[in-house]
Amino acid sequence: MPGNQQKPESLETDSDTSPSCGLSDLSRGGSLESRCSSSRSRSFTMDDESLKHLTHEEKDVILFFEETLDSLEYDFDEPALCDSGIHCHSPQSLEESPSSHSEPEDVIDLVQPAPASGEAESLPDMPQVTGAPSDTKHGTPFLEGGKQAAENSLPPPDSRGPEVFPLPPSLPVPAPSAPRKELMSPSPPAEHPKLLRSVPTPLVIAQKISEKLAGNEALSPTSPSKEGRPGEWRTPTSPASRNGDHVGVWHRHTTQSAPKVHRFPSNISVTNSAGKDFNKTISKAAVNVQERKAQVLANINGMSFIAAGDTSSEERWQKAEEQRSGSADGARTLGRAGMAGEPGAPCAGVPARAQQSRAVQTEQPPALANGFQSVHEALRSEPSSFVPTSKTITFRPDPAVTGKLARQNASRSLYEPRPDGSQDARKRTGSLPRAVGFRPQGITVQFSGRGSTEEARREALRKLGLLKENL
């Protein structure tokens, strides 16, 4: 062929294109000469630069895309494409195309081998359907001539066989989509799915959309397709958008999901309130720890005060116990204090009335299950590791005894025995009951429902008789 002699040896795959371009130039006029020459020049430049390292198939695909782009530049005014010459021209159609240009049998011959290409979904089908009527060199009435030629080419059953019979009733289907002529023009060959690879998927989807738009304009909110005209979804789909079907079609519908957005900060506020309560419990626990440290020292010193013969503080202690007997927490803590105040051999100078009041108070709290404290109570009654310096607690005895007891408390808590403590203080601390598994007990004051203010602390300590009233 003379076309093969014009191309270099490096472009091996272009051997099929040159005869097709030559025959198409002979049959369809000189309008395609510039197009084939542009594709040749493009392929030559690519051959010199980038086609050296490409394979046989890659060169074929690149050339196919070049010719497709060349055909799209003319906007279907001169739609005889070289890609149809590459893949679709059988020798029978090549012989018939120069002889009979306007006959509908040429269209049938061009469309029938079209599925063999299979590389483009919608673009190869459009020139194959409209290839023969364009041979008359009319640029403007191309779409109308293509439709007439396609309708004329469908009825003869000799070349198509028995597959053509269900086609005539399906011809008026693409009528509603008049503005989509460039997509709907190859729709008649797209209607018979029995042909291999002859149904382009975008055309079927567009046809279904046009049918739904034509038949369901009034019932558009109930149609399952979301690709309808946006004007129909403005007013009637406000209830459907609440269900989440068409949310995001209009910005007006996205504002209806605002209650969900407002629920989320409410959840956050709930968790924040729970966190505040948790912080309150932490602060209460910290206050309880500080009060426990103060009360441990006050309890030990208070026992020594009772041993010293302070009967007025003992009377106030008894009155405070009677007032707080209704509270379960107060009864439990005072019961622990009473249990701690029951020695096997009572100290000298302790009145019998104080012993009786302590015995009464020990009967009020429920007895422990195993005779041991719970972990929580044991931790709360644990003595402090340092001597607290609280200003709200003042002690009645002289400073000498107070200093001795403070030093003794520090030595007991740090487990470092000091020999400078007096023998009386050691006898008093040794006379306290120490069961196996028990730690030295103290009074824990719980402020339930009250704040951690200074007045509440002083009032509680005043009720317990541990605070000097005339400060």
Swiss-Prot record:
Keywords: Methylation, Phosphoprotein. Residues 26-43, 90-101 have a biased composition (Low complexity). It comes from Mus musculus. The modification Omega-N-methylarginine is found at residues 263, 450. This is Proline and serine-rich protein 2. The keyword Phosphoprotein applies. It comes from the Eukaryota. It holds the Pfam family SARG. Residues 154-177 have a biased composition (Pro residues). Residues 354-364, 383-393 have a biased composition (Polar residues). The modification Phosphothreonine is found at residue 45. Residues 1-46, 82-247, 310-365, 383-437 are annotated as: Disordered. The modification Asymmetric dimethylarginine is found at residue 263. The modification Phosphoserine is found at residues 43, 187, 220, 223, 431. Residues 313-324, 415-427 have a biased composition (Basic and acidic residues).
